[in-house]
Amino acid sequence: MEFRWNDWNEEHIAEKGVSPFEAELVIRGAVRPYPKRIEDDKWLVWGRGRGGRPLQVIFVLDDDDCVFVIHARPLTQREKRRYRR
C-alpha cells in the first residue's frame, strides 16, 4: 500500500494534531467494518494511532491506487464510546 503526501494534506491533518505516520498506521491496521465507503469515492477508517489514541482518517484512492489522506482527527468522546463497543 502506497501513500501520497504533499504539503496540503500533511498540514491539514497536522492542524488536528495527527501525523502522517499515525494516519498510515490507522489505515494499515484497519479491521472490519473498516474501511467504510462514504460519499463519492471516499473511505473512512476508525483506528488507533500512536499510543493507542483513537483516530478517524478519511482518504481517497488516486488513479494509480495510492492512498491520499484528505482528513484525520482524534475521535470525539461520543465516537470513542461507540468505537469501544
Question: Model segments located where?
Answer:
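Ribonuclease/tRNase effector modules and their secretory precursors
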Residues: 1-85
